[in-house]
């Protein structure tokens, strides 16, 4: 049992191989988008697809090629916009068209390149700006008295 368990959660070489395999799969999907006539007029498509692939791999926590509810929750918290369980379910439903409980890479790229207004798309676009504009305070919090509390 401990041998099975250690193989499932092993890092190092096995994790590197897993990530390399995932990257090849996503690169193959990117090639499909590059060959698709529907996206031929998209500006800077190769650069965008590369950026989308990196973000997707960062938030695909279980390395199964899908962003599930917990991965989305972590992504939103990391971006500084935590959402409720219900809001995240609605986001996933909007991105997948209500077909799935997880966001596949194809759904993710379609959402990012599509004309639909998705909350997730806006968050991903402005991720860098939001993090730069609100630096986290350092040191202990300032002292407050009871009169200053709401």
Curated annotation (Swiss-Prot):
One of its GO terms (biological process) is ruffle assembly. Residues 47-82, 83-117 form the EF-hand domain. It is a peripheral membrane protein. The modification Phosphoserine is found at residues 2, 134. It comes from the Eukaryota. Its main location: cytoplasm. InterPro entries: AIF-1_EF_pair, AIF1/AIF1L, EF-hand-dom_pair, EF_hand_dom. It is found in: Cytoplasm, Cytoskeleton; Cell projection, Ruffle membrane. GO terms for cellular component: actin cytoskeleton; cytoplasm; extracellular exosome; focal adhesion; ruffle membrane. GO terms for molecular function: actin filament binding; calcium ion binding. Ca(2+) binds at residues 60, 62, 64, 66. Residues 129-150 are annotated as: Disordered. Keywords: Acetylation, Actin-binding, Calcium, Cell membrane, Cell projection, Cytoplasm, Cytoskeleton, Membrane, Metal-binding, Phosphoprotein, Repeat. The modification N-acetylserine is found at residue 2. Homodimer (Potential). Monomer. Actin-binding protein that promotes actin bundling. May neither bind calcium nor depend on calcium for function. This is Allograft inflammatory factor 1-like.
């Amino acid at each position: 049992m401990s041998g099975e368990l250690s193989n499932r959660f092993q890092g190092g070489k096995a994790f590197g191989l897993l990530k390399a395999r995932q990257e090849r799969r996503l690169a193959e999907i990117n090639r499909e988008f590059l060959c698709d006539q529907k996206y031929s007029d998209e500006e800077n498509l190769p650069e965008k697809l590369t950026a989308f692939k990196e973000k997707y791999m960062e938030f695909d926590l279980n390395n199964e090629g899908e962003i599930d509810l917990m991965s989305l929750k972590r992504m939103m918290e990391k971006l500084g916009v935590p959402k409720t369980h219900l809001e995240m379910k609605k986001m996933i439903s909007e991105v997948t068209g209500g077909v799935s409980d997880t966001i596949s890479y194809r759904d993710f790229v379609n959402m990012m390149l599509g004309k639909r207004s998705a909350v997730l798309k806006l968050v991903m676009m402005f991720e860098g700006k939001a993090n730069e504009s609100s630096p986290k305070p350092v040191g202990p919090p300032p002292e407050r008295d009871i009169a200053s509390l709401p």
